Amino acid sequence: MKVRVVAVGRDRSGLYAPAVEEYAKRLGRYLRFELVEVPEARKLAGTAGAKGEEGATLLAKIGPRERVVVLDERGDELTSVAFAERVRRWMERGQDVALLIGGSDGLAPEVLARADERLAVSRFTLAHRLARLVLVEQLYRAMTILRGEPYHK
């Protein structure tokens, strides 16, 4: 199984990228993992236009048979153990998974319509680059839970 995090924008601040890269490297021991960053839309067209442009770019990165899971504030809130079980089910299906993270204005309706699942990483509103770090860390945590390794206590 391959898991891809497809996210709008780059971490220009440098705050989160090193940690995301570290967890991505660790994930490589368990599964094929890829982080795909797509550019943020210019806000000249307004919020709706920018969301639409980013949405089209995200959808273009998805394979026809990939399971699409979006991060959305109205998505399922899971514990780490429940998320690990979700990952286990994805692995049992043998289907590649694309986890999509929108930009600062959220996801376009077309992206939400394409989603097979919606997940929320927190009830808090998080910067989308911080949400990316939380998601990648939780993927790593899920793999250690499934393997019975001591990372998750």
UniProtKB/Swiss-Prot annotation:
One of its GO terms (cellular component) is cytoplasm. Pfam families: SPOUT_MTase. It is found in: Cytoplasm. S-adenosyl-L-methionine binds at L71, G102. CDD domains: RlmH-like (cd18081). It comes from the Bacteria. It is an enzyme of class 2 (transferase). Keywords: Cytoplasm, Methyltransferase, rRNA processing, S-adenosyl-L-methionine, Transferase. Homodimer. Belongs to the RNA methyltransferase RlmH family. Specifically methylates the pseudouridine at position 1915 (m3Psi1915) in 23S rRNA. This is Ribosomal RNA large subunit methyltransferase H.
